[in-house]
Every structure is written in structure tokens, then in C-alpha cells.
Amino acid sequence: MAESDDEYDRKRRDKFRGERDSYRPERRDDRRPMGGGAGNARDEWAERNPFRGSAAAGGGGGGGGVGGGGGARHRPDYSDYRGSGPRPRYGSPGREMPPAKRMRPDWGDGEMRANPRFGYDPYLVQAWNDHYQSLHSAYSHSGHAPSAREPPPSGISNSDTQTQPAMLTLKQFLDTQDENISDSEVMRKYTEYKTDFKRQQLNEFFVAHKDEEWFKNKYHPEDSVRRSDEQRGFLKRRTDVFLELLNNGTISNVKVDSSQADALVRVLDTCVIKLEGGTDEDLKILDEKPKDPAPVYERRSERSERSEATESVVVTKREPESPKHQTKSEKDDDDLPEVESPQRKNVRPVNSDDEDWDDDEEMPAAKSEQQSELAAEKPAKQLNDEESMQANIDKNQKKSKKRKRTSSDDESSSSSSSESDSDSDDEKLIEKYDVEEGLRADQKAEAEKDKEEEEERAATAAAKAKQLPPDSPTPDEDVDAAAVEEQKNEVVAIKTEVNDEESQKTEQPAAEEEKSEQPKDDPEASSKNGEENEEEKAEKSEADTATTKAAAAAADDDAMTETIDVDKLKDSLKPRALHRTSSIFLRNLAPSITKAEIETICTRFSGYLRVAIADPLVERRWYRRGWITFTRDVNIKEICWSLNNQRLRDCEMGAIVNRDLSRRVRPANGITAHKQIVRSDIKLCAKIAMNLDERFKLWSEVDNADNAELNPEELKEATNGSGSYGFNSKNPVLQNITDYLIEEASAEEEELLGLAGDSKDGEGEPIERDEPLIQVLDRLVLYLRVVHSVDYYNHCEYPYEDEMPNRCGIIHARGPAPMRVTSNDVQEYIKSYEGKLQQFLAKTVQLSDENIKELGAKNPEKEVEKFVQANTQELAKDKWLCPLSGKKFKGPEFIRKHIFNKHEEKVDEVRKEVQYFNNYLRDPKRPQLPEHPGSSKRTESESGRGSGGYRPPMYPPFSAMPYGFAPPMMGGGGRGGRNFPQARREMPVEHQRRLIGYHDLDAPVNSDMFD
């Protein structure tokens, strides 16, 4: 039996099979026999078809195989899955172009032509030519631009990568010029052509992207200023947080070392909490250890013996949040447990619902007491119809109380079963996908428990006040008063469980029942004391007034209780975990999508914080990536699912859940702890901090206020004649920094004792640590990380970090140090690391006006004049039209005056557009399409050094003939009679030997001689 597809590939690995078969007139598929036989020993190997019988595999010769002998089972070949049609003669079906083979005689006209001179390549000969380009010709396109199918070199494999069009080489440019043009004129025109080509590409790129938000934030006169102010506000906020941590000693107590990862993470989290507006109370969340997931205790009813017998049934409690979703059968038989599928187990902590567990245990006892009371009252009092109705009302009210007060009337029981079933299904779906319900249960449980305790105390106090009426009631009235108090307590509890609308609905039936109970007690009293009807009426009126006063007092107490509970809940809130967030990653955002559009979609979800959009990449066709940040307690998967079902500007955003950072402290090279490297790092960090502070003008306001009092000479002396660090900086981490940059060494002692450095280089020296230097360096590294989002030990910057889900996410720290280090390793490390940080060390200087003029900068006044001329149209003699307004004038000067007076905003837009374009040109790191590979990668001969500086030689440079053969015949008139010097062979100078001439002594004197 074949172990893999290698058995199928073995046939394709037959090197010369395709070569031999292509020479035969018939096709391979026609020659392949369908039945088993001895003739197909090469095409039908036995091991290729292990599931066929012996007849198919061995041609009926006997045995072998899996099938044994009878009823051979046919297993389709791999070629059967390709469908009908001839099989390509080269390679696998999924490959677009054939592999490089030698030329087929039936493809062309018998020539070894490199590629078609005009048009596209229908036979994909270009693939052959590109593969053997280094062996046959350095000019793959015979003087023409590369075809569209040419794969870009230098490792760029993405065919969707946009590039500039190929610029003409000097040879191609010469083909477009006159034959009699001089060399100097050719060079001048070619230089102009390159300049115009660059201007055109910059202008086209600007026009293509000027309406996109990311481009406006960089260069637009208004949007760029607004974005810069926003970023500067972020930096100032970060600076304030860093100074606060520096003053309270948090920064000084931590080392940027991988061994102190927990302390570093705590510092970063502290910064995030402060940036989010947290207080010192919120910082206590960092001291709490992460809680383990609470154990799940699934309570089973004592009566459900069948659930104990089988393990496939899980009994859970009914949720209190969905009272209207209960069906009629559930209301009639409430004490039965709810049976759910074993695939989904509702995770509930122990303290999530203590009150419900107690109520469930009291349910059987309460029902038995209720039944005994009813059985005792019926023969004694012989209840009439009204009394039976009252008993039913009391029974329903007690039953609803034992059901966690899900309802106070029969509205939910009157709903149709179909609606309740559909609602319950929706509720189950919500529970199924609510992955963080278990996490929120812990937080809600404690708050609800405290709230219920306070409400019970207030209700008890109100009940005691109601139990003392002005006149002592009869024993029967005493029982009724207890029932009234129980109902009032129930109303108070219902108010705390449901919202305001439901509470109003439940209070009205309760108040009506209280009023209906009071006259029901009067007939009993009148039947016992028929002679004292007037006294009973007086007592009834007094009882009514007392009841109304008690109800009003209870309402006031209830309102006060709710107000007090809200204040207490605010005071008793836990520290907020502001450093923990949930986020969604958007993989594809079209360049036309704005940040405001994403915010509009996300603000519909609760817990939305911010959105960050990265700069576009040319490799992704200028598509961008985005991160949407929410609070930690949201259901991030449900939000992600909702975003995936939406399209923005006909673009699928590709939303996925962004995971938390795995390792926030990552180790760097341990050699960085060496004293010499630490001193070099301090110098580099100080330069970077100085450059970034100057770029964003963080300390410029303080410096300007102090330097305003100094003379120019004093100011120059204060800054040491240049912007060097440490002398007049208001940055606290840069003050007195020069004291640590002066290197000390005992050179004289080593010279006297004869201690040479060669021995140290051979054996190496141990790592020398200087704690004061390391402390200064750590303060600088943390300043760069917290304020400027620069990770020094990773020599990179984390852009737009204030809008990202993690505002201080990752930091690199010094790793474990090696035992010994050589001087060469130290010097090499310092040199290489300084090169990696050049992007931060070099100051960003905008291009001057002279430089941008060469790139095609525009003049505002000239562009305004062009705008006026474009909107001045002559209709007839002394009749001119302004297209902006449609008005007609007698002369162009009137239109000019009209445009400047009535369309001033249009003129301002033209000036802003000019400034917009010039700002783009001033940026030395401006985004633009990469150069075409054919333009950027040229050989020396293409750049104009061979053939007199203009024309390259026309023979293959990489496959030159062996030494001793004459060079190609390119002398004489050259192309078109031009007198170019004779071409030299493209060989290295050391291999070019002088030609030796042999002179015959008998020959005439004036014969040809080489020397």
C-alpha cells in the first residue's frame, strides 16, 4: 500500500518521459491501455493501485495485491480527478507556467528566440527566458520594457504589489531620439526625462490618495495640524504620568531586567491605569491576585431521583431574569427541576444566588403549612365565594414569592405557549453564546447581596411601624394585618428586583388587594358584634387612614432606601481594572474608510472605548488594519460576530478577536549589562530623547520661558553652541547626564604593568556591572518607553499606541548576561546597535524650497491664476461666462473681480490644495510607489559605462567566449554610422592581457604590428 502521494509523483519525476513522448505523434493518454496487461509495466505500477485486484495489478498473472483474486475493486487514478481534457505536458495542474525546459521545435519557427518582440507572450516563453536569463542574455527583453508577467526580482513574490511604471533605460531612450544627436544633448535630455518622470509619479500618487483620511492626517494644512495637536496632547499626558511615577519612586525602584518581569509589568499597568483616568484606589487592583475560576456546584432537587440515576441529565436552577419566558406548565408545577442538555452546563459560582437556594429549601415546608392552614380554616369559618377568591389570591402571591418574585399578577401565565417557547429558545441561545456571563456573576452577586440586605432592614423597620395602629384590632384583624405587612414587604422586594416599569405594574395590583382586603374583614366583625355597627364603621375609617399613612410612609422609606443604596454602591465599588481590555482586530480596511465611520458602527455596542487604524501598506494595496477596544466585561465574541455580518463601503472588515499579549517582558542580549555598553546606551538614549522632545516640543514652553530672559550670546553658551543634551534641558531624566558619559580607565597603570589588551581579547573579560550607571540607563529607557513609545532594547517604535488596546504593552529588557565577553564583541555590538538606531538619532529635516522645486512644487499665486483662467470662458465678443455661478459678464476683468468677491472660498481651497501638495513634497520619507524592478536594478553596462558610455555591448556578458577568441565585431560605423569606440570585452581587469603580435623578420618593414 502506498504510504503517501510520492508514488504518484514518482511518475512525474521520470526526467525524460515528457521529452520522449512529445516527439511522438500520438498523445500519451491515447497510448495508455485501459485494461490490465503486461504492456503497461511502466504506466501501471502495481504499488500505485494497492486497492485493485491481482488482475488489474499483475495482468492476470496471479496473485498478489490486496484484492486476492476475485472481484477486483477499481480505485480511480489521480488523473481521473482532473476531469476531461488533455493533461498538460509539464508540471502539476495547479502551476500557472511550465517549468523551465529546453525549447520545443514546434513552439516557434525554429529559432532560439528569447521572447516575442511585440505583444504578449501566448506560449509563456518568457518563463523560459527569465529562468535562463543569467546564462543567455543580460537584456531579457531585447531593448523593451519588461512584460507584465515578469516576476519581480529581489525576492518580491507578491504579484499584487503595485510599482511605478518602468523608466526607460538610456539605451531605450536613445532609440527614441534622432540619429544625429550629440552625446551631451543625449545626456541632457535623458536627465530631463528622469526628472519629469519622477514629478509625474509624485503628482499621480498625490491625486490618487489626496482624498483619503490617512493622507490628510499627514499633509493636509488643517487635518495634519489637528492630528499633531492630538498626538502632542497624548504625549503631554504621558509625560505627566511619568513625572508622577518618577516623583513617588515607582520608576527608581524597578530595573529594566528580565529577572524583574513582574515589577516591570506592574509599572506598565500603573501607567495604563493613570492614562485611563484611574485613581490610587484603582491601583489596588494590581495587588489582587488573579482569581481562579470559581468551582461549579450544580444543585439537584431532592425529589428528582431520576436525575441522580442517570449521568446524562444536569439539573439547574431557573434564571430569575426572564419571568415572562416561563410557560404555563412551568407556572403550574414550579417545584419541578429544569432539565437541560448535557452539552451545555451553566457555570454558576457558589455565591451567585444564595437567596434562591434558601427559597428552594423552604418551598416544601411552606407549601405544607399553607395547605394545613387552608384545611383548618375551611370547616371552621366556611368560607364564602369572596373568601375563596381571597385565599386564591394569597396562594398565588406566596407562590410568586417562592419563585423569586417573578411576577405579582397572572399576566405572564396568560401569554401564549408559542410565544413563551420562542422567547425561551432565544434566551437559551443568548446563554449559550454569553461566554462571560460566569465572569460577571461574581461581581453582580456581591452587589445584589448587599443591596438586598439593606432593603430587608428598611422593610423590617417599616413593618414594625405598621404593626402599631392607634386602636387594638381584633384577633382576626391581627391576622389580616400580618398578611398586609407580608404583601407590603413583597412589594418592596419586587421594586429592587425589576425595573421601574415592572415595579409600577406590580404596585397597582398590590394596592388594590390591600384596599379589597379591608372591607372583607368588616363583615366578619359585624357578624360577631352586630350591635356595634357604628363603632365598627368608625374603627374602619380610622384603620383606612392609618393604612394610607403607613403606605405613604413606606413609599417614602422605599425611596430613601433606594437613594442610600445607590450611594453605598458607588462607595463600595471595587477597584476598576482599567488596564484590562477586550479588543477586535480588523484585517481589511479599504483606504476610503474613515475612522468616524468605524466609530459610528462601534458606538452601538456597550463598552466601546476607542479605535486605532494603522497606516496603509503598499504590499496590501494600501489596505489598512484596525483595532477596536472595548471594556473587559463585554461579550467580545458576540460583538465580533455582529461586525462580521456587516459590510462597510462594500468592504468586508475581517473582524477577529484580538488575543491578550502573551509575553509582555521579553529578553534582549545579556551583553547589554556590561559597563562599557551601558555607557554607550546612555549616550544613545539621551540623543534619542533629545531629538524626540524637540520634534514634539514637549519641553519647549518651559525652555522658551527661561530663555526669553537670556541674551543670544548667553543662550548660545547655555546650549553649548548647539543642541547638545544635558546643559539646559528641563527634562528631569536628562539633567546632569554628562556626569555619567565621561569614561574612566587606568591606562597608565596597565601600561606600567605591561597589561596588554591582547590577552583580554583572547580569553575575554567577565561582565562588569556598574549599578549607578544602570540606574541612570533604566530611567532613560523607561522614559522612552512610557512617553515616546520607543522600545530601546528592541530598537523600534510602537506607533499610535494611545489608540491601541494596550497603551503600554511590550517592553524588552536585559536578558541573562554571559560569563565572559571579549573586547571585539563589545565594540562590534556598540557599532551595530548604533546603526540600528539611526532612524531615531537622525533629525527629520524638511526639504527646502529649492529642493521641492525640482520635484514640481507649485506656486499658490500661479495656481490661483490658472483657476481664474479656467473659470473664464469667452462666449462671444464682449460676452464672457463664469462657470462657477453661470453669470455672464462683458469682460474677463469683471469675472476675476467676481471670483475673488463671490467665490473666495474656492480660491482658498486652491491655495490649501497647493500647500497640501507642497507639504507632501517636503517630507523626505513621503509614501510613494516603489520603483519598478527593471528601473532600480541595473547593471553597470546599462548605466552607461560600456560602449563609449552610452550603448552596452550586444553579446552575452555572463557567457563570454573563452579567452583567445576575438571580441564581437562592433567597430567601424556601429549603429547607423555613429563612430563609437570599439567595445572591450566585459572581463575583469586582472584577466585582460595584452595582445601579443608576432613579427616576421622577412616581411616588409611597414607591415601591421600590434605593439
From Swiss-Prot:
Residues 56-71 have a biased composition (Gly residues). The modification Phosphotyrosine is found at Y90. It comes from the Eukaryota. InterPro entries: SE/Ars2, SERRATE/Ars2_C, SERRATE/Ars2_N. Keywords: Nucleus, Phosphoprotein, RNA-mediated gene silencing. Residues 1-113, 138-162, 284-558, 919-953 are annotated as: Disordered. Residues 8-33, 41-50, 103-113, 284-309, 316-331, 375-384, 427-450, 512-543 have a biased composition (Basic and acidic residues). Residues 352-363 have a biased composition (Acidic residues). The keyword Phosphoprotein applies. The modification Phosphoserine is found at S92, S322, S352, S472. Interacts with cbp20, Dcr-2 and pasha. Belongs to the ARS2 family. This is Serrate RNA effector molecule homolog.
